[in-house]
């Protein structure tokens, strides 16, 4: 929790198009906002600012309720206020009334002292309100307007290395069978031994790396620039018994983290695939896991319900209770005993005691051993993922072991990682692991190495900490998937507006929402075709959803089969159809969005509408930098029409994108960023249109379609200097990850850089650069001591430069 002391200012231009202003904030103080108190009542007694700084302000001693040197005289507005120059230091104070401690007010008008921390001497105005018994602090003397020093605060918006890809996400076992000789993974026996049964949707079907390699033309034809493979490491071939038995075709039951699963091929075949892909300008990403291994460990008790730490804490080898979280991020960890340290006693079949590679994974004390996760509370990170062996990722051996494992795969040539089950691993692990792995990649000259995590939440507030607080490059944008599916089904465009309004959570000096991989469905939740069932015109709506994905910020991800119009009957196994001829009766009978059943033949058609549409969108994106990496500024969001501008910061030419999710064309009027410009169609069916002097245009957007219009000139420059105001306001309260925003002119292209420093300090720390006419960043103040006084500054640059 924190409180803000702030002041809004008009901007003053050193040159056209550049403006700045400052405000200040007080962390966790309990102080109130200047100018927000209720009307005050007159007070006849002496009102004194009493604290441990009084001797610095002219009093003979501290905590003197009767010292007039720190009195707060009554102002014309019947509040009590005075200005003091307070030296650097950590201070505490109250307001005493009547010259004694009989009546005194601290935090929230109570007994607790206000706290104040200054990095340097500062002129502060203290204001006490009789009616509310609350006190506000305002920093005086903040620099007004734009100055020469502000140039050093201006930074370009971030575009992260390796963050401009078109992904094709493929489940290797279900893509193409290029080498039938490896279908049983070099394992003798029947399907319960080797896991191969192409007639069962829960077993291996024969797809492999050789099949991927042989079909790179098909993948490249979609405009793909990066292939993301499901986990390819050696898996436990079969888990479960009887009707519950299934195979590790999906790749998430790993036993050997150093080898490609024999069902899929060899390490040498992977290297050959990577080399060929690279020659085509296509990267190869691995889906990786650190949360768990295959289900090798059993519990001697024969029970698997989660046991929480309050009921049964961990105990070291000497029997002392401890919390692994207390050691996370450190180089030490208590010695453990498999017989006595865990809620459940871990046991392993003697035939499998050495099955895991690297060898350290066979140590059963490196697992949580608490039973199956309940998907809430502590079990999210301590529980077994549906029986899979959940690693003790707080342990330095696990951290160091996985750093080495994945550094070795970087050496093989992998271009990036998609990190499975990231939310089920403690944050301290990611803070160390991501830094070590990324630093290693960079040291090998892999400057565009990119990692994104799977955090299964549709809320930027829950997703963004994995980007803000670690060196994870980005996260899968589950919030995007949810909002886009709703829009494609015909719901209001307001959902998209709300989605993109949270992009600022990802804005830091090194990260940005533009790096988020965006997707419409996947192998777990189900396909976009399935989500659209019952909405009518499902094929056109899928094309609309893909248009939105390729024309908005982020890195589009196409799940294999969506380009063929696969629908499926749900998530998991029901969304994992193969592109090569399927022997699964259910898959053969599944319908496609193109109006026919999948059947028992290969489906690598390049002339079907969805494949052609995606390829066209990829070509459009590749040929127009603004559509790939440009700023995205909302222009219209009402009913079924969503419109926005994309602007590349170098060319500064507006690309207006408008989409309509209704079954009839819609005509809308809105203000663009380029008054007087003529816009011509770059994509879609629309006649040229000219904006009036205020920038207004009227568009008729075709049913279930998108149009892209290109302006004939750069974005408009302001006619005259405007004004800028900055939030937080003086004395306003902030908590945790606090918003810091600037109010600038509407309907403009602008870049606004934010920074902070402790009041009294010299150096500024950047918070990030926001784009568009509603700039905002977030500042995590949770690490600042209570009472720290912080100064914020925003510098906004528009098209005038």
Q: What would you call each of these model-derived segments?
A:
Residues 86-87, 781-789:
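Surface-exposed, short loops/turns at beta-strand junctions within beta-sandwich domains
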Residues 159-166, 173-412, 433-444, 450-453, ...:
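Substrate-binding/active-site clefts of carbohydrate-active enzymes
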Residues 149, 274, 278, 291-292, ...:
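Active-site-proximal helices and loops of the catalytic beta/alpha 8
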Residues 43-90, 98-117, 769-770:
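Aromatic-rich carbohydrate-binding modules that target alpha-glucans
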Residues 93, 790-792:
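Hydrophobic beta-strand segments within extracellular beta-sandwich modules
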Residues 97, 794-796:
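Conserved structural position at the C-terminal beta-strand
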Residues 2-5, 25-29, 39-42, 46, ...:
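Carbohydrate-interacting/catalytic domains
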Residues 99-134, 692, 696:
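Structured interaction patches on ligand/partner-binding surfaces of diverse proteins
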């Amino acid at each position: 929790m924190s409180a803000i002391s702030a002041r809004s200012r008009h901007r003053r231009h050193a040159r056209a198009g550049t403006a700045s202003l400052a405000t200040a904030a007080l962390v966790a103080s309990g102080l109130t906002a200047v100018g927000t108190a209720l009307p005050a009542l007159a007070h006849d007694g002496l009102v004194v600012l009493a604290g441990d700084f009084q001797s610095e302000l002219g009093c003979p001693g501290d905590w003197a309720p009767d010292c007039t040197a720190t009195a707060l005289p009554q102002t014309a507005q019947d509040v009590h206020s005075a200005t003091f120059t307070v030296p650097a230091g950590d201070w505490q104070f109250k307001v005493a009334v009547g010259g004694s401690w009989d009546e005194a007010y601290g935090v929230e008008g109570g007994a607790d002292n206000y706290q104040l921390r200054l990095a340097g001497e500062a002129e502060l105005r203290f204001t006490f309100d009789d009616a509310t018994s609350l006190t506000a602090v305002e920093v005086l003397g903040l620099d007004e307007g734009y100055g020469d020093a502000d140039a050093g605060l201006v930074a370009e918006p971030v575009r992260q290395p390796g963050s401009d890809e078109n992904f094709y996400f493929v489940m290797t076992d279900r893509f193409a069978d290029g080498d039938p000789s490896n279908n049983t993974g070099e394992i003798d026996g029947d399907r319960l031994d080797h896991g191969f049964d192409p007639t069962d949707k829960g077993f291996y079907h024969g797809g492999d790396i050789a099949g991927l390699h042989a079909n790179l033309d098909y993948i490249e034809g979609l405009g793909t620039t990066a292939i993301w493979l499901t986990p390819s490491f050696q898996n436990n071939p079969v888990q479960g018994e009887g009707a519950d038995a299934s195979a590790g075709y999906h790749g998430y039951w790993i036993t050997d983290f150093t080898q490609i699963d024999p069902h899929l091929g060899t390490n040498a075949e992977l290297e050959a695939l990577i080399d060929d892909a690279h020659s085509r300008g296509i990267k190869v990403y691995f889906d990786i896991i650190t949360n768990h291994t295959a289900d090798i460990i059993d519990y001697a008790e024969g029970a698997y319900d989660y046991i929480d730490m309050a009921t049964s804490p961990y105990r070291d080898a000497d029997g002392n209770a401890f919390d692994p979280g207390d050691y996370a991020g450190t180089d030490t960890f208590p010695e453990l005993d498999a017989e006595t340290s865990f809620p459940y006693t871990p046991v392993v079949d003697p035939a499998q005691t050495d099955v895991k590679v690297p060898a350290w994974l066979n140590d059963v004390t490196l697992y949580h051993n608490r039973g199956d996760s309940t998907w809430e509370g502590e079990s999210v990170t301590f529980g077994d993922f549906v029986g899979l062996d959940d690693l003790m990722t707080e342990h330095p051996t696990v951290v160091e072991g996985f750093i080495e494992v994945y550094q070795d795969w970087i050496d093989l040539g992998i271009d990036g990682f998609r990190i499975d089950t990231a939310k089920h691993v403690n944050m301290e692990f990611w803070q160390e692991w991501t830094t070590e792995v990324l630093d290693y990649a960079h040291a090998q000259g892999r400057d565009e190495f990119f990692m994104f995590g799977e955090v299964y939440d549709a809320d930027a507030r829950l997703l963004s900490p994995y980007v803000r607080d670690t060196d994870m490059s980005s996260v899968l944008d589950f919030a995007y998937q949810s909002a886009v599916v709703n829009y494609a089904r015909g719901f209001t465009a307001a959902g998209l507006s709300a989605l993109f309004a949270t992009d600022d959570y990802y804005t830091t000096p090194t990260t940005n929402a533009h790096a988020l991989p965006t997707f419409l469905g996947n192998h777990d939740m189900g396909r976009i075709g399935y989500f659209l069932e019952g909405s009518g015109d499902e094929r056109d709506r899928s094309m609309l959803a893909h248009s939105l994905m390729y024309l908005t910020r982020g890195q589009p991800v196409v799940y294999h089969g969506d380009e063929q119009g696969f629908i499926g009957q749900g998530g998991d196994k029901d969304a994992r159809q193969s592109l090569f001829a399927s022997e699964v009766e259910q898959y053969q009978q599944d319908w496609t969005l193109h109006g026919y059943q999948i059947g028992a033949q290969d489906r690598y058609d390049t002339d079907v509408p969805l494949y052609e549409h995606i390829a066209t969108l990829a070509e459009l994106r590749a040929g127009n930098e603004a559509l790939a990496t440009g700023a995205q500024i909302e222009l219209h969001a009402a009913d079924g029409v969503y419109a926005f501008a994309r602007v590349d910061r170098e060319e500064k030419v507006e690309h207006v994108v408008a989409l309509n999710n209704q079954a009839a064309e819609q005509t809308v009027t809105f203000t663009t960023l380029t008054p007087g410009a003529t816009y011509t169609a770059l994509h879609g069916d629309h006649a040229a249109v000219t904006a009036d002097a205020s920038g207004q245009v009227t568009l008729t957007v075709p049913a279930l379609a998108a149009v892209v219009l290109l302006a004939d000139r750069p974005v408009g420059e302001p006619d005259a200097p405007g004004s800028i105001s900055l939030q937080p306001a003086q004395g306003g309260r902030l908590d945790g990850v606090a918003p810091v925003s600037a109010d600038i002119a509407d309907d403009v292209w602008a870049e606004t850089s934010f920074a902070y420093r402790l009041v009294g300090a010299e150096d500024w720390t950047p918070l990030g650069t926001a784009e568009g006419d509603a700039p905002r960043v977030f500042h995590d103040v949770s690490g600042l001591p209570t009472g720290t006084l912080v100064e914020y500054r925003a510098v906004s640059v528009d098209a005038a430069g």
